[in-house]
């Protein structure tokens, strides 16, 4: 599922270039929240800070719900958040979207430019959800569960619901996430 860089509706920077300029003009003063230290949203922020060469104040929360409340309330200014959480808030005008974090624009947010389009080629961040089981789970059971989940994810009504909130189904094996090289590999080392 893609992530979006979003801000409170009343924040001064409404585009990614304006936000970078604001962060450079006020180093360490612009407040970014995340769903928690080490979360996918926090990782997206740290990668973006490194790529854009900016310094911001990071405030980790205990999940997305309290972060979204404080973003809408003006206690934090910006954050990276999963499209499934951010989309209804964008549609209601409670937050604004500055950028999305996949290489190509998501179908559910076609008017929001990517971070890569706005001067940071190769930038990509996403959130994934998966099913896991015990280490010694029989291979036949793993295969059966994977097939059943893929079959459900292929259903038209499920695809429609996922599309409504900006979720993008990857399906398949979670092992690919761990064995495929990532453009992020080594970026923060």
Where would I find each of the regions flagged by the language model?
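Short Pro/Gly-enriched coil loops immediately N-terminal to beta-strands
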Residues: 1-2, 91, 122-127
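Hinge/capping helix and adjacent helix->loop/strand transition within the periplasmic-binding protein
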Residues: 1-66, 115, 128-161
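Alpha-to-beta junction loops
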Residues: 26-29, 72-81, 94-96
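Mature extracytoplasmic/periplasmic domains
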Residues: 158-177
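Conserved small/polar residues in nucleotide/adenosyl-binding loops
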Residues: 178-183
């Amino acid at each position: 599922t893609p992530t979006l860089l979003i801000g409170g509706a009343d924040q001064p920077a409404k585009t990614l270039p304006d936000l970078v300029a604001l962060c450079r003009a006020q180093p360490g003063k612009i407040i970014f929240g995340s769903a928690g230290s080490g979360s996918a949203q926090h990782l997206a922020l740290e990668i973006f800070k490194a790529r854009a060469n900016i310094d911001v104040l990071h405030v980790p929360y205990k999940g997305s719900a309290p972060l979204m409340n404080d973003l809408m309330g003006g206690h934090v200014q910006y954050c990276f958040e999963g499209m499934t959480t951010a989309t209804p808030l964008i549609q209601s005008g409670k937050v604004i979207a500055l950028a999305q974090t996949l290489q190509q624009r998501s179908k559910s947010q076609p008017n929001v430019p990517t971070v890569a389009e706005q001067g940071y080629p190769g930038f990509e961040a996403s959130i994934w959800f998966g099913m896991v089981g015990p280490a010694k789970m029989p291979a036949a059971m793993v295969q059966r569960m994977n097939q059943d989940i893929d079959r459900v994810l292929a259903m038209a009504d499920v695809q429609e619901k996922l599309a409504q909130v900006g979720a993008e189904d990857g399906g398949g094996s979670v092992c690919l996430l761990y064995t495929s090289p990532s453009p992020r590999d080594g970026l923060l080392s």
